[in-house]
């Protein structure tokens, strides 16, 4: 690929040709985000395949997601839609109130309360929810393990996970692993929500993400701006995608062939979450992509990505694969948008939109087409 950009013609701006070095540099930043999302979704799909009984639809797990309406198979489509929208509205209202409460606690410097709450929640997720899943898996796979060993494992896993995730310093890879486990555990329980409520909730969360991140009065935007003003870390469940220490060095060495002088000023890498503006220090000379060496992604994004793919896995491998690739493609588009525009971007809308369209397209069009081809002995290679 040429390093020359064609001159502007007919009043049009010159076309930027992405070089191989630029492509490799962008891939080095994006892949550390794609890998953990892939692992989280794959684990959720594995749990669904192991524990879900085909043909048996859960009537709901209770709680906030079914506070208004409990879906029944005998209900009409209009009743299911109205009930699902009511459930989604209640859930979004709860999330909005909780986020504003988080903002007020952070504003008045009560971060210790936030950390204490998250630590307690993490302990419950690892110990109770995770323990319940573990017992179900052992029972389903008919694996005999004595209860003392199970309790000792759960004690170490839950207490160690809560401390390493929220309080103790430790290896980044360990914290990343525990965060992936949190997203897997929570997302599996969300897959037990009734179907209509699930899809309505996913769409509602994508719309809420747009409001919370992009609007001036959005709660997430207000929290990020306050954190930037104080130069403090946000007390939240955030996955940091910083890769191995040599990744940034390898990327700089590769790109140094083209922009050695401009790279000199980038010795210090910047961390830029999807809900936070890009630092100007991460610019890469003439490159159109300005992704930093490290990106932070909210754990809620992991959870709802996994819920979508887990729900798709309940129907067929075709729908699951289509949704899986669509969600990852949407995430890559969002990350490229972050690099191109350097603005705060919500991570849910693009992936949820593509994943939802892929699910219904595969379920109602692609899968019947493939089954019909198979029934007639036609194979496309």
Residue ranges and their predicted role:
Residues 1-381:
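Multi-pass alpha-helical transmembrane bundle typical of ion/small-solute transporters
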């Amino acid at each position: 690929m040429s390093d020359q950009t064609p001159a502007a013609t007919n009043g049009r701006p010159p076309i930027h040709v992405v070089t191989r070095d630029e492509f490799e540099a962008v891939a080095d930043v994006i892949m550390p985000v794609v890998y953990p999302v892939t692992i989280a979704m794959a684990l959720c799909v594995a749990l669904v395949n192991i524990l879900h009984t085909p043909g048996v639809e859960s009537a709901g797990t209770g709680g906030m997601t079914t506070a208004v309406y409990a879906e029944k198979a005998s209900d009409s489509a209009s009743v299911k839609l109205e009930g699902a929208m009511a459930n989604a509205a209640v859930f979004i209202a709860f999330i909005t109130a909780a986020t504003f409460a988080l903002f007020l606690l952070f504003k008045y410097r009560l971060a210790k309360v936030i950390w204490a709450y998250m630590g307690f929640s993490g302990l419950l997720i690892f110990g109770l929810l995770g323990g319940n899943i573990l017992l179900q898996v052992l029972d389903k796979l008919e694996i005999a393990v004595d209860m003392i060993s199970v309790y000792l494992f759960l004690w170490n896993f839950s207490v160690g996970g809560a401390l390493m995730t929220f309080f103790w310093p430790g290896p980044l890879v360990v914290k990343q692993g525990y965060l992936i486990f949190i997203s897997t555990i929570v997302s599996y329980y969300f897959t037990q929500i009734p179907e209509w409520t699930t899809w309505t909730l996913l769409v509602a969360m994508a719309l809420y993400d747009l409001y919370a991140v992009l609007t001036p009065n959005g709660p997430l935007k207000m929290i990020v701006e306050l954190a930037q003003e104080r130069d403090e870390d946000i007390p939240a469940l955030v996955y940091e995608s910083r890769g191995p220490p040599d990744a940034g060095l390898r990327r700089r060495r590769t790109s140094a062939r083209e922009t050695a002088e401009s790279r000199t000023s980038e010795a210090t890498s910047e961390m830029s979450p999807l809900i936070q503006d890009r630092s100007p220090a991460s610019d890469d000379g003439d490159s159109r992509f300005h992704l930093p060496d490290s990106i932070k992604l909210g754990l809620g994004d992991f959870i709802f990505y996994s819920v979508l793919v887990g729900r798709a896995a309940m129907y067929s491998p075709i729908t699951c694969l289509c949704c899986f690739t669509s969600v990852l493609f949407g995430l890559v588009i969002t990350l490229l948008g972050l690099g191109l525009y350097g603005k705060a971007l919500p991570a849910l809308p693009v992936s949820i939109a593509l994943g939802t369209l892929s699910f219904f397209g595969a379920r109602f069009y692609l899968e019947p087409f493939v089954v019909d081809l198979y029934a007639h002995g036609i194979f496309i290679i």
